[in-house]
């Protein structure tokens, strides 16, 4: 007869075997879902190692290519790569995973991106949704004047000088500065906004500080340069300081709207920090993601001179045209610019931008959500009874490479948007995911698209571009995905005639 000690040991081993092997591998509601790695049912260590090594995006993409639209990444984590999955998870308003709150909260104070629960997010989104709507932005006199100032007095004069002197320029930091100046002017008004396009050495210092900011703890961020800088911008507004000498003073559209809304409908957050936390998120996204989009759009166009010519023909149909005076015709007057709606209606420009955002999504990484707790669980692509609290996500990188929707998906082919197969354009648009989808879709998507189209129309009306140095142009595939080499050196040549 076995001793009590031996019997206890056998029982313990049996329980451990059941808990750590039999249950997760064979009895878990997730057991039928293909495993991305043989250890996925047991531990998250494998996927965490891939994340920490910066290989999460490609790892998940390859897992979907091998196993299909739903894969298990860890004991309580799934990745989904299908249109039906998007509808269930994101249109179905699954709440965000705690990961967002850990990573994106500024000043120890919630903002929309960092809010896990849908209700407070919806409340704050209602405060700002009108001023970020496409109709409001296209009709905005303030945004029109911001565009005229940034283009006429900052960007185009720099490109004219670079072209005249036959210099090359790193367009990544320059166009990140364009994004920052556009965004900060819409938030704070032109008299209180940044002017980093004209201060590129100072801007590079800011970018260096921001690289450190991205890996800091919450506590270190609060004492650091970036949060202090943003808070100083907000406090200048409260003191009614207006340091910039500009030809047109625009309204602080976003700042005023958010401040007034929080005054009328306060919550338990300190109002100054609630405003600063939200606006810092806008400033971060507004310079980084648009700067990436500008860079890869110019990189692709620079490899296709014939397409540049075709795009220019399309741009010259605008009225007024974006023609900027040559160096011998210097003028201090602001450009008259085409309406945003007329620029938005240009099919080739739209196709080039869409294809750039598809292939070179600035945010290629998974956007995690948590499955809701329901009586019978949830169903995804034929897998049923998925319990609540499971980390679940999709990523634009994988979605944008579904071959059935985007044939030869690794190739940059703008004409796929102009000449889609019968009925295919609907799926192409539904799977187009650089801004997410559903109630948590990026609030600034319309602003970003309008800005990028406006700026690129101005650039390619006046210049051709040519690559001088694109070493390290491949994306690092981080959450916000920059070129590995942090540069793209281009030559700008004025268009004759």
Feature map (PLM): residue ranges:
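Short, small-residue alpha-helix embedded
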Residues: 289-302, 455
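C-terminal helix/juxtamembrane-tail motif
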Residues: 481-497
């Amino acid at each position: 007869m076995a001793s009590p000690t031996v019997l206890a040991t056998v029982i313990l081993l049996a329980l451990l075997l059941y808990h750590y092997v039999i249950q997760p591998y064979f009895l878990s509601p997730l057991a039928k879902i293909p495993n991305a790695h043989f250890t996925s049912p047991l531990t998250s260590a494998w996927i965490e190692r891939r994340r920490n090594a910066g290989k999460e995006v490609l790892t998940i993409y390859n897992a979907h290519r091998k196993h299909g639209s739903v894969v298990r990444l860890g004991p309580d984590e799934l990745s989904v790569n299908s249109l039906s999955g998007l509808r269930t998870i994101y249109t179905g308003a699954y709440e965000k995973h705690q990961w967002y709150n850990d990573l994106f909260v500024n000043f120890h104070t919630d903002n929309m991106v960092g809010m896990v629960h849908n209700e407070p997010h919806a409340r704050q989104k209602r405060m700002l949704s009108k001023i970020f709507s496409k109709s409001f932005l296209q009709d905005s006199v303030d945004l029109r004047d911001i565009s005229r100032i940034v283009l006429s007095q900052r960007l185009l004069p720099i490109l004219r000088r670079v072209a005249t002197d036959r210099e090359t320029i790193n367009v990544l930091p320059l166009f990140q500065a364009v994004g920052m100046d556009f965004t900060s002017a819409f938030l704070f008004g032109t008299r209180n906004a940044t002017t980093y396009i004209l201060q590129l050495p100072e801007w590079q210092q800011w970018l260096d500080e921001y690289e450190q900011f991205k890996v800091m703890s919450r506590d270190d961020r609060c004492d650091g340069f970036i949060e202090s800088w943003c808070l100083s911008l907000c406090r200048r507004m409260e003191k009614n300081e207006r340091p910039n000498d500009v030809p047109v003073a625009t309204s602080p559209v976003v700042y005023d709207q958010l401040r007034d809304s929080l005054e009328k409908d306060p919550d338990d957050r300190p109002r100054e920090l609630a405003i600063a936390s939200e606006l810092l998120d806008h400033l971060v996204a507004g310079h980084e993601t648009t700067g990436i989009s500008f860079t890869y759009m110019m990189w692709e166009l620079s490899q296709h001179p014939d397409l540049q010519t075709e795009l220019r023909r399309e741009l010259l149909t605008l009225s007024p045209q974006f023609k900027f005076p040559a160096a011998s015709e210097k003028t201090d007057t602001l450009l008259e610019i085409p309406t945003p709606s007329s620029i938005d209606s240009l099919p080739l420009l739209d196709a080039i931008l869409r294809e750039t955002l598809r292939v070179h999504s600035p945010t290629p990484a998974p956007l995690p959500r948590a499955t809701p707790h329901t009586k019978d669980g949830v169903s995804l692509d034929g897998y049923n009874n998925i319990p609540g609290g499971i980390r679940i996500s999709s990523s634009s990188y994988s979605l944008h490479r579904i071959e059935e929707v985007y044939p030869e998906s690794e190739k940059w082919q703008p004409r796929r948007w102009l000449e889609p197969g019968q009925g295919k354009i609907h799926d192409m648009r539904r799977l187009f995911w650089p801004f997410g989808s559903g109630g948590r879709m990026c609030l600034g998507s319309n602003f970003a698209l309008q800005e990028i189209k406006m700026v690129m129309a101005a650039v390619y009306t006046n210049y051709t571009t040519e690559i001088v140095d694109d070493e390290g142009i491949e994306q690092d595939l981080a959450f916000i995905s920059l070129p590995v080499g942090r540069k793209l050196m281009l030559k700008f040549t004025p268009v004759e005639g």
